[in-house]
Amino acid sequence: MPSYTHMPYVRPSAILLGIAFDHAASFLVYGPLMGDIWKRAMSTAPHVEYDAGSKTKKVATTYVSNFLSTAVQSYSIAALLQLTGTVTLKGAFFVGLYVFGASGLPDVVDYMFTESRGTPYILVKTISSLVKSVGLSVALIGYGVRRI
């Protein structure tokens, strides 16, 4: 009886690399590279009030949800690279652009027209999303996601 797998195998180290890449990209984009622009964009944004719960619980929840969503994103991009047979950096760049077009571009349009966000906010979010999709796919293909 043949064995069918619906989810391709991705090395756990590739997922960990993706998590590290995403956190490093967030640190660089929201920190040294565009931190001042981000602070200006957030100072003009309307503040959202949250319930007065435990700050430790909020931080833990935020970090765990970010970690899990980044792990899923890393697995998904690695699986997509594997299933499409991508072996070159150029191919990985285009796969990353397709992922950005499917996931990041609708957010940019939403920020512009629905939420009427300012240009600095849209700029930082777009660059962050682009780095996290295109950069992650290039980093993963450079690492060697595919089985040979």
Curated annotation (Swiss-Prot):
Work out whether the entry's keyword set contains Membrane. yes
User: Which keywords does this Swiss-Prot/TrEMBL entry list?
Assistant: Membrane, Transmembrane, Transmembrane helix
Indicate the family of this protein. Belongs to the UPF0591 family.
Pfam families registered for this protein in UniProt: DUF1761
Q: Which domain of life is it from?
A: Eukaryota
What protein is this chain from? UPF0591 membrane protein C15E1.02c
What is the scientific name of the source organism? Schizosaccharomyces pombe (strain 972 / ATCC 24843) (Fission yeast)
**One term under GO cellular component:** membrane
- Indicate yes or no for the key word Glycosyltransferase: no
Transmembrane annotation, as ranges: 14-34, 80-102, 122-142
Q: What is its main location?
A: membrane
Location of the protein in the cell: Membrane
Topological relation to the membrane, as annotated: Multi-pass membrane protein
